[in-house]
């Protein structure tokens, strides 16, 4: 699908879909719990539906109804052997978490995915699972792969380049036969691990860890219990309408946001404020008032929030001066190399970008329409759409974004929501 975007702004009120990270963790725990769980307001997207299918294939019973809530009857940790490899689509989080859960089964469980997922590194997680007693086979440390358990517990080191490796092991380790000790020499994306720990705390899982998150001791032989939880709005997704209002001079009110939630990407509000944005927040909401905003440059550390790099690079393109986005080398390991891709595509739109190993420097300027490519990365596609909205009203040609169907990975209603709010979008 191609998305054509012309000069426009958004104004109005909206709600963002539920958090993808919370939805996948909820599915993982519910699928292993003994008894019925209820997940309210889940994100229904390509990634979460891949995880839902995986949970069903492993023996969980799930009733979707109208998708306002999912009823999940878990396996109690006794998974069945799937009839075929589990297709995780484009979900890196899902692949890593469900690969770790598969290590609890004595049957071989295989995983596949799309072309992008097959490029995502899996070796650090597979090596840790092997240390804990599983047997794994893979295509050079990548998907497709097979995991045969059960893990028995033990001690291993975990590469913290991606927090997903640690989160996956923390979700599987309580159900291992023995205790598990996880050593983490360094850790990126700390808020995502804190989200996992919050879920484990609600489950009363017995584990200990130090304040620097370098050592975790998980007691084995535990059981997940059924739960009834509501998924909060996704701050990673909320960044897009907030940014669109900021850079186009529009206004937006988002109501379903919980600023007490551990989601790291709520930091978008503070990061944008550091660049001059005026964002009002309160219990459950964030608001940008209509009117022009004079944005200025800043130096932003995105180590905890790598998913914000694409949209913040667009905000930086609309700001005066040179904005530096740094300490976020892991952004190169997402659905695409987001540093390289955003630098390349913004240059097409007339913006000067200097790329370095762990980030980029963006010199603000006047964006011009261009034919750009999302490289099938949902956050890149949405960020480029917002960049296209800022191009001059006198421009005759639109910005055209290739592979815009990738937006369905996390925000399937993006085009409809933005069009309702005033964006000039046309999907072909």
Task: Report each predicted region and the residues it spans.
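Short, structured segments at the rim of ligand-binding sites
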Residues: 1-428
